[in-house]
């Protein structure tokens, strides 16, 4: 996925308001946005992955953000407490990813684009294989 949805009312969200009032609230918010973009890149239903089979770890996120492991762990715990992310099977997951990101619509759009491209190529092939007869 090359984009993620962020609603214009994000700063009116009580969870975001509470997080922004925390010490280092700006950092927490930035990391939240980074988690959304990483989940969007991995395209695994909101799972926050480094690669197809490797979930993002506290250590990975600390390296990416240049923060300490302790700070990242505290931030992730706050996001879990606010029910913004889940931690299941050693994987951080954006809660309600499908609902907010319309991933199903994105997949449908990709499928429509593939079908449109297939038809275009078929038409190009048919046009290039036309027999010309001379009189």
Residues of each region from the PLM?
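Positively charged, structured surface patches that bind polyanionic biopolymers
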Residues: 1-93, 101-107
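Charged low-complexity intrinsically disordered patches
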Residues: 105-135
């Amino acid at each position: 996925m090359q984009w993620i949805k962020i609603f214009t009312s994000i700063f009116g969200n009580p969870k975001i308001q509470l997080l922004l009032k925390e010490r280092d609230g700006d950092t927490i918010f930035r990391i939240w946005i980074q988690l959304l973009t990483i989940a969007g890149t991995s395209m695994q239903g909101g799972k926050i992955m480094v690669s197809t089979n490797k979930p993002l770890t506290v250590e990975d996120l600390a390296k990416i953000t240049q923060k300490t492991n302790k700070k990242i762990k505290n931030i992730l715990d706050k996001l879990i407490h606010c029910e913004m992310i889940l931690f299941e099977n050693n994987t951080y997951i954006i809660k309600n990813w499908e609902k907010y990101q319309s991933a199903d619509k994105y997949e449908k759009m990709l499928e429509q684009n593939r079908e449109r491209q297939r038809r275009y190529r078929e038409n190009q092939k048919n046009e290039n294989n036309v027999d010309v007869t001379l009189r």
